[in-house]
Amino acid sequence: MKLQQNFTDNNSIKYTCILILIAFAFSVLCRLYWVAWASEFYEFFFNDQLMITTNDGYAFAEGARDMIAGFHQPNDLSYFGSSLSTLTYWLYSILPFSFESIILYMSAFFASLIVVPIILIAREYKLTTYGFIAALLGSIANSYYNRTMSGYYDTDMLVLVLPMLILLTFIRLTINKDIFTLLLSPVFIMIYLWWYPSSYSLNFAMIGLFGLYTLVFHRKEKIFYLTIALMIIALSMLAWQYKLALIVLLFAIFAFKEEKINFYMIWALIFISILILHLSGGLDPVLYQLKFYVFKASDVQNLKDAAFMYFNVNETIMEVNTIDPEVFMQRISSSVLVFILSFIGFILLCKDHKSMLLALPMLALGFMALRAGLRFTIYAVPVMALGFGYFLYAFFNFLEKKQIKLSLRNKNILLILIAFFSISPALMHIYYYKSSTVFTSYEASILNDLKNKAQREDYVVAWWDYGYPIRYYSDVKTLIDGGKHLGKDNFFSSFVLSKEQIPAANMARLSVEYTEKSFKENYPDVLKAMVKDYNKTSAKDFLESLNDKDFKFDTNKTRDVYIYMPYRMLRIMPVVAQFANTNPDNGEQEKSLFFSQANAIAQDKTTGSVMLDNGVEIINDFRALKVEGASIPLKAFVDIESITNGKFYYNEIDSKAQIYLLFLREYKSFVILDESLYNSSYIQMFLLNQYDQDLFEQITNDTRAKIYRLKR
């Protein structure tokens, strides 16, 4: 095909398809860089393929694996039948690639589809070339790349593509009044809700804004009102078969009998659609939010009356913490300058093309990251990318109005240079963003070996970070995972890992048996059920009773319980312990925990003191610590020569002190911790290899992870 010399004015279908293919290939190739880099490390491989880089991905991988097998265990929390698991199952059924290869590369290809709606939206405004530049930028912007790179096997791979397709149908409808687009809008909403159920609020906001836009700009056009009615039906909680049948039926009636449909019928249809939405429970999420904020005080009081109080998991998750404005701008547009130009361009785009206002819900959700956490930034990426593309158009248009003459050749060269420099920060980010796999091959092998020792109904007690991978590799059940980690859920695993071995063993058995019972009894609070069944007046009294080695269980043992203790958990030990350090009766912290892991960075040859990378100094021949100028005596210095053999040297220094200093020779790392954490089951059983053989049997003994079977 011979391209026009002034390609910025070309909006032909062939030209558009070529740009889409180029942008798609560019996006995929950028995501393959990580594969090339990671392939150099054998510890990232398992079963002859690179492993994935996201914990949540193992949930969908487990679901897909179970779908391929054709079954899963009752109450095993498998994502059997979930959207991504289903799509993976379909691909595995028709493609000649291994399961591991499919889940590794899916995000690279599906996430790159974002270029399609970006370029097509720009084409609706006769700005295809500028849309191409926007697609290049948006497809690899920092936050979007981070959550859709190769190996990032998660629903994020389509979480922007689908709402952008919805936005495309909105814009196309406002410009062309295309009746086929009338059908696409509700269909894309249905697909988006199936793919990502949490998209309900965004869908609701987009439909609401489209309704407001209709009343302001298209109040006399029937096709817009019918679109609203069909989208409301798509948003309802009816089974998808009924929704699709109803949508197609109404579409067909409008397509063939439009002249006989008046506004009274349209408004009646909208009323019926809202009624269907309400009766099917579609308004419940909205009503819940209103109830929570309007009647907040009484709701909180009722919550206190109904259950115990636990540590809030949101305080431990980086993605829900507020972020620095500069980081916010870089995550959306890869650089501060491009972000500013993109924002200006978006304002100009909305000024010149009112239909772009329909993108505000996505932009607002992305900007929520300033308060709600960095995970939301991706929603603003494609909208701001379109803003940048339009800024370039406005810039060249400004030059023409000022009669600044540029030849077509110079204009094209300048446009290419601007495009290159705008995406350069994103390319640099891709080069330096070298994410590791969730587990190493050694850790995956340890869990895979457990599959041959444990039964599918057995439980592995571990921290929630490892729940999904454990279920995937070991094919067992877990108490908590990436989707089940509220304070009341985390309490039990935290207790088992951070308390001494006797209460930990008792709680491990109780938490598993009561979790299984809760599937039938539907306990709102499992700990409260324990307290009630054992006739205790408070959670504190019940938890203290677990210190008895002869504790009598009222429940029968129904399965084996394993405890997974990886080395990688050591760095987050204070977070793990925080949940069980909270008194469920009043929500207060029982004690102030002290824990830090650090490496030596320098040694004073004169005094012999050792400076650690956390700012702490080891002084007086390893007998005290210097923290912010204050000297803190040590209770003991423990030199751990071998984690697997339990070979260590215990040097008591001050029996009245509370702080221990541990040196891990195998990792060349220091651990500073208080007495309660030193006596915890995790430190004793993993680092020191000291375990009560009446309570536990060691199944796996490795420097990377240990697994114990509960004998109780």
Swiss-Prot record:
<feature type="binding site">
    <location>
        <position position="319"/>
    </location>
    <ligand>
        <name>Mn(2+)</name>
    </ligand>
</feature>
<keyword id="KW-0997">Cell inner membrane</keyword>
<feature type="site" description="Interacts with target acceptor peptide in protein substrate; important for extended sequon recognition">
    <location>
        <position position="331"/>
    </location>
</feature>
<feature type="topological domain" description="Cytoplasmic">
    <location>
        <begin position="1"/>
        <end position="12"/>
    </location>
</feature>
<feature type="transmembrane region" description="Helical">
    <location>
        <begin position="13"/>
        <end position="37"/>
    </location>
</feature>
<feature type="short sequence motif" description="DXD motif 1">
    <location>
        <begin position="54"/>
        <end position="56"/>
    </location>
</feature>
<feature type="topological domain" description="Periplasmic">
    <location>
        <begin position="236"/>
        <end position="239"/>
    </location>
</feature>
<feature type="topological domain" description="Periplasmic">
    <location>
        <begin position="147"/>
        <end position="154"/>
    </location>
</feature>
<dbReference type="GO" id="GO:0018279">
    <property type="term" value="P:protein N-linked glycosylation via asparagine"/>
</dbReference>
<feature type="topological domain" description="Periplasmic">
    <location>
        <begin position="433"/>
        <end position="712"/>
    </location>
</feature>
<feature type="topological domain" description="Periplasmic">
    <location>
        <begin position="281"/>
        <end position="327"/>
    </location>
</feature>
<feature type="topological domain" description="Cytoplasmic">
    <location>
        <begin position="400"/>
        <end position="407"/>
    </location>
</feature>
<dbReference type="Pfam" id="PF18527">
    <property type="entry name" value="STT3_PglB_C"/>
</dbReference>
<feature type="transmembrane region" description="Helical">
    <location>
        <begin position="263"/>
        <end position="280"/>
    </location>
</feature>
<comment type="similarity">
    <text>Belongs to the STT3 family.</text>
</comment>
<feature type="glycosylation site" description="N-linked (DATDGlc) asparagine">
    <location>
        <position position="556"/>
    </location>
</feature>
<feature type="glycosylation site" description="N-linked (DATDGlc) asparagine">
    <location>
        <position position="535"/>
    </location>
</feature>
<feature type="transmembrane region" description="Helical">
    <location>
        <begin position="356"/>
        <end position="372"/>
    </location>
</feature>
<feature type="transmembrane region" description="Helical">
    <location>
        <begin position="179"/>
        <end position="194"/>
    </location>
</feature>
<feature type="site" description="Interacts with target acceptor peptide in protein substrate">
    <location>
        <position position="319"/>
    </location>
</feature>
<feature type="site" description="Interacts with target acceptor peptide in protein substrate">
    <location>
        <position position="56"/>
    </location>
</feature>
<feature type="binding site">
    <location>
        <position position="56"/>
    </location>
    <ligand>
        <name>Mn(2+)</name>
    </ligand>
</feature>
<dbReference type="InterPro" id="IPR048999">
    <property type="entry name" value="STT3-PglB_core"/>
</dbReference>
<dbReference type="GO" id="GO:0016757">
    <property type="term" value="F:glycosyltransferase activity"/>
</dbReference>
<feature type="transmembrane region" description="Helical">
    <location>
        <begin position="377"/>
        <end position="399"/>
    </location>
</feature>
<feature type="transmembrane region" description="Helical">
    <location>
        <begin position="128"/>
        <end position="146"/>
    </location>
</feature>
<feature type="binding site">
    <location>
        <position position="154"/>
    </location>
    <ligand>
        <name>Mn(2+)</name>
    </ligand>
</feature>
<dbReference type="Pfam" id="PF21436">
    <property type="entry name" value="STT3-PglB_core"/>
</dbReference>
<keyword id="KW-0464">Manganese</keyword>
<feature type="short sequence motif" description="WWDYG motif">
    <location>
        <begin position="463"/>
        <end position="467"/>
    </location>
</feature>
<feature type="transmembrane region" description="Helical">
    <location>
        <begin position="99"/>
        <end position="124"/>
    </location>
</feature>
<dbReference type="InterPro" id="IPR048307">
    <property type="entry name" value="STT3_N"/>
</dbReference>
<dbReference type="InterPro" id="IPR041563">
    <property type="entry name" value="STT3_PglB_C"/>
</dbReference>
<comment type="pathway">
    <text>Protein modification; protein glycosylation.</text>
</comment>
<dbReference type="GO" id="GO:0005886">
    <property type="term" value="C:plasma membrane"/>
</dbReference>
<feature type="topological domain" description="Periplasmic">
    <location>
        <begin position="195"/>
        <end position="199"/>
    </location>
</feature>
<feature type="topological domain" description="Periplasmic">
    <location>
        <begin position="373"/>
        <end position="376"/>
    </location>
</feature>
<keyword id="KW-0328">Glycosyltransferase</keyword>
<dbReference type="GO" id="GO:0004576">
    <property type="term" value="F:oligosaccharyl transferase activity"/>
</dbReference>
<dbReference type="Pfam" id="PF02516">
    <property type="entry name" value="STT3"/>
</dbReference>
<keyword id="KW-1133">Transmembrane helix</keyword>
<feature type="transmembrane region" description="Helical">
    <location>
        <begin position="223"/>
        <end position="235"/>
    </location>
</feature>
